[in-house]
Amino acid sequence: GVSSPYHDCNMMDYMRGDTYNWELTVQMIEHAGLTDLFEGKVDTMPVITFWGIPSYSIQRFIFDSHENEDLTKVYTKVSDIPKSLCREFLLKHVTKGKILKEDIAYKNKEFEINESGQDGGTWITCLAGNRFIAYREGSDYAGVPDAGEVNLRCWSPSWGKIPMSSPDIQPTNGVVHALNYSYRLGHI
């Protein structure tokens, strides 16, 4: 079946209602003091696009911290991570306004996304100032070019491919493009 992308609640309430995917994300938002932003209560930014960090990415970051030689940077829970670092991570994933998949330009098929001749896609600038390219890419179906599914993909000049999961989740104050569980926190 087809599920509806629309949710009759703000972004925070949407994520609070899906603890499997977003429990640690919600904890990070609250710890960073950014709850108002994700609830649509910031006057200058009532609508946002969140390139959604799944809980598994945060969990991996916490586990990976145990490999650090610097014991002051070993975390066992979200609240152990410095608030400023949580804030930095989150703002690297938030864009002002609502950017839907249909608002993103297609990739020029003649070039790979990172090649100099690439003139497709849409450059995204996040609140932390980092930039990446979002692009749509069609697929073939039954041998017919571009007759299949259209995917939203992202590529970072610093980190390469940004794994996507589910685009266009639409709570009342913006849109969430959920990143894949394999996403490494901060690699955007």
Predicted regions and their residues:
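Mature, structured domains of secreted/extracytosolic soluble proteins
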Residues: G1-I188
